[in-house]
Amino acid sequence: MSAWRKAGISYAAYLNVAAQAIRSSLKTELQTASVLNRSQTDAFYTQYKNGTAASEPTPITK
């Protein structure tokens, strides 16, 4: 059985953890903004009324 299955996580979550570990292990001169920004996700939501968009997409913030 796979290690990620034994850990009880999905394959996508396993890949996310592995990618984050690789990015954090890079030498500091290779940790550029473009590399570190790959782990960020942008999410937007749109309100709908009667099947049409009632507003522009709004970013979800923490």
Curated annotation (Swiss-Prot):
Tell me where in or outside the cell this protein is found. Mitochondrion; Mitochondrion inner membrane
Q: Name one GO cellular component term.
A: mitochondrion
Q: Does the keyword Metal-binding apply?
A: no
Any one GO MF term held by the record is:
proton-transporting ATP synthase activity, rotational mechanism
Record's keyword terms, sorted: ATP synthesis, CF(1), Hydrogen ion transport, Ion transport, Membrane, Mitochondrion, Mitochondrion inner membrane, Phosphoprotein, Transport
InterPro entries given in the database record: ATP_synth_F1_esu_mt (IPR006721), ATP_synth_F1_esu_sf_mt (IPR036742)
- Modification sites for Phosphothreonine: T52
Kindly list the biological process annotations in GO that this record carries.
proton motive force-driven ATP synthesis; proton motive force-driven mitochondrial ATP synthesis
Q: Belongs to which family?
A: Belongs to the eukaryotic ATPase epsilon family.
**More info:** Present with 4280 molecules/cell in log phase SD medium.
- Role: Mitochondrial membrane ATP synthase (F(1)F(0) ATP synthase or Complex V) produces ATP from ADP in the presence of a proton gradient across the membrane which is generated by electron transport complexes of the respiratory chain. F-type ATPases consist of two structural domains, F(1) - containing the extramembraneous catalytic core, and F(0) - containing the membrane proton channel, linked together by a central stalk and a peripheral stalk. During catalysis, ATP synthesis in the catalytic domain of F(1) is coupled via a rotary mechanism of the central stalk subunits to proton translocation.
Its assembly, as annotated, is: F-type ATPases have 2 components, CF(1) - the catalytic core - and CF(0) - the membrane proton channel. CF(1) has five subunits: alpha(3), beta(3), gamma(1), delta(1), epsilon(1). CF(0) has three main subunits: a, b and c.
Kindly provide the name given to this protein in its UniProt entry: ATP synthase subunit epsilon, mitochondrial
Give the lineage.
Eukaryota, Fungi, Dikarya, Ascomycota, Saccharomycotina
